[in-house]
C-alpha cells in the first residue's frame, strides 16, 4: 500500500467494475489476443467464462486487460514470492581470506574449509589480501585463485571471476547442486548401512566378505607392510626430535 496525503492507494490492479475506461485491449484466458473491444463486451466475456477482467497494463492506450481467475492468480503470486524469499534466505555466502604468498600447510587448511562449505551447499567468497609491494604483483592473486578453483572444481564452479577490489582480489565459488545433493544421499546411505551393520553384525560381515574378490583387501585396510611402515614413522620422528 502506498500512503499519500494521509490516504492510501492500493497497488493491486483494477478488476471488473473498478475498470473505468471505454475500451480495452483484451487478452483471453490462454493468453490469446482478442483485440480492442468495448469495456462492456470484455465484462460480458468475463461473465461467460466465469472469470475476472483484470487490468494488467494500466499505462497502455487502451489499457490491457486479461480474463483470469484473480483469486487463483493472487494465491500463486503469493506462493512464488514466498518461495523466492525462502530461497534467498537460505543462500549463505561464506568467506575465506588468503595471502598471495600463503605457505602450503595454510593453503591446504584453507582449501579444506572451502571444500566443507561447498559440500554444505554454501557459496564461498575467496579474498586475496595484498600488502605493501604485493599490490604490484596482482598475478600472484590470479594464480592462487585459479589454483584453488581447479582444486575444488569437482565440488564448485567459479560464479564470479577474479577481480580487483581495492587492495584485495575476490572470487566467488558456487556449489554444484547436483553433486552436493548426491553426496548428501551417499552420506545418508552410508549411515543406513552402518545402522544395519550395528543391528546385524554377523550377517553384515558375511555379506561384506562375499563381495570382496579373492586376493583383495576390504576397503579401508592396507597391506601389513604399509601398516608397519606407518607405525614406525612416528618413532623415527620422535627420535629426531
Swiss-Prot record:
Annotated region described as Disordered, given as residue ranges: 178-241
Record keywords, A-Z: Cytoplasm, Initiation factor, Protein biosynthesis
GO CC annotations, alphabetized: cytosol; membrane
Low complexity bias: start-end ranges: 230-241
Biased composition (Acidic residues): 208-229
Biased composition (Basic and acidic residues): 180-197
Cellular localization per UniProt: Cytoplasm
One BP annotation, GO: ribosome disassembly
Described purpose of this protein according to its UniProt entry: IF-3 binds to the 30S ribosomal subunit and shifts the equilibrium between 70S ribosomes and their 50S and 30S subunits in favor of the free subunits, thus enhancing the availability of 30S subunits on which protein synthesis initiation begins.
Quaternary data: Monomer.
Protein name per UniProt: Translation initiation factor IF-3
Gene symbol of the encoding locus: infC
Amino acid at each position: 500500500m502506498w500512503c499519500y496525503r494521509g490516504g492510501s492507494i492500493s497497488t493491486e490492479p483494477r478488476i471488473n467494475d473498478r475498470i473505468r475506461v471505454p475500451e480495452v485491449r483484451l487478452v483471453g484466458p490462454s493468453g490469446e489476443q482478442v483485440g480492442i473491444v468495448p469495456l462492456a463486451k470484455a465484462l460480458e466475456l468475463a461473465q461467460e467464462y466465469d472469470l475476472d477482467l483484470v487490468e494488467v497494463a494500466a499505462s497502455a492506450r487502451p489499457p490491457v486487460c486479461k480474463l483470469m481467475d484473480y483469486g487463483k492468480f493472487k494465491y500463486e503470486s503469493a506462493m512464488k514470492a514466498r518461495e523466492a524469499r525462502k530461497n534467498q534466505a537460505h543462500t549463505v555466502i561464506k568467506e575465506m581470506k588468503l595471502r598471495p604468498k600463503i605457505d602450503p600447510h595454510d593453503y591446504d587448511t584453507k582449501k579444506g574449509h572451502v571444500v566443507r562449505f561447498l559440500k554444505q551447499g554454501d557459496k564461498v567468497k575467496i579474498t586475496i589480501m595484498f600488502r605493501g609491494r604485493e599490490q604490484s604483483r596482482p598475478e600472484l592473486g590470479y594464480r592462487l585463485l585459479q589454483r584453488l578453483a581447479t582444486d575444488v572444481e569437482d565440488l564448485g564452479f567459479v560464479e564470479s571471476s577474479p577481480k580487483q577490489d581495492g587492495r584485495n582480489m575476490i572470487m566467488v565459488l558456487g556449489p554444484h547442486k547436483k553433486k552436493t545433493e548426491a553426496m548428501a544421499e551417499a552420506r545418508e546411505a552410508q549411515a543406513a548401512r552402518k545402522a544395519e551393520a550395528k543391528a546385524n553384525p554377523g550377517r553384515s560381515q558375511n555379506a561384506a566378505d562375499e563381495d570382496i574378490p579373492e586376493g583383495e583387501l576390504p576397503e579401508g585396510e592396507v597391506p601389513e607392510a604399509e601398516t608397519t611402515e606407518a607405525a614406525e614413522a612416528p618413532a623415527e620422528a620422535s627420535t629426531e626430535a
